[in-house]
Every structure is written in C-alpha cells, then in structure tokens.
A protein has these predicted regions:
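Acidic, glycine/proline-rich low-complexity segments that act as flexible tails and inter-domain linkers
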Residues: 1-24, 54, 76-93
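Short, glycine/charged-rich beta-strand-loop motifs at protein surfaces that mediate ligand recognition
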Residues: 20, 33-39, 52
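Short, structured motif recognition centered on aromatic/hydrophobic residues
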Residues: 26-36, 45, 62-69
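Short basic/hydrophobic patches in alpha-helices and adjacent helix-turn junctions
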Residues: 36, 50-55, 64, 68-71, ...
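Short amphipathic alpha-helical segments at helix boundaries and their inter-helical linkers
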Residues: 41-48, 69-84
Length: 93
C-alpha cells in the first residue's frame, strides 16, 4: 500500500501539479471537478475542497464550478459533491 501511495503522490503532486501553464487555483478546481465526476470518492473530494481553500478558491467559486458540472456529471454526483462542500465549508451563522 505504501508503494502505491508514494507513486500516487509523486505522479499527481510532482509531475502533474508542477506543470507551469495553469495556476494552482485553476489546477485545484479542475481536480475537484474531475473527482466529483467520478462519484464514490468523497474522502478525496473533501480533501480537494480543503485544498482549493488553501490555494485561495472561495466556497462561492467552488459552488459555481460544481454547478457548471451539473449537465455533464448529473444530479446525483453534483449533489454528493455539494454535500461534501457543505460538510467541509458549512454556512456561517
């Protein structure tokens, strides 16, 4: 298992995330949308929601990005992603 985790980290966060054309905010948002489209990846989705916040994307931007995915990934996956968004970034009271 450790060997797979090491490979995943070096490939995704080394080779892929260090490319120069996209900025980190756009790259993290695209990653979030891709994971949302897969379904069944809620732990990874939550991690990338927090990752988006860490690089400066707001809840509003993420809400808009996931809404944009709706016609392409369907209601169930979009609603699951929005549920994860609400869990990681609950509405302020």
């Amino acid at each position: 298992l450790q060997q797979i985790q090491d490979y995943l980290s070096s490939f995704c966060f080394g080779d892929t995330y260090t490319r120069k054309t996209l900025n980190l905010q756009d790259r993290e948002m695209l990653t979030l949308c891709a994971i949302a489209s897969l379904g069944g990846c809620e732990p990874q989705l939550k991690a990338h929601i927090q990752g988006n916040v860490n690089v400066g994307n707001t809840k509003g931007i993420l809400l808009e990005a996931l809404t944009q995915c709706l016609p392409y990934i369907g209601f169930p996956r979009t609603l699951n992603a929005l549920g994860c968004l609400s869990q990681v970034l609950p509405d302020k009271k």
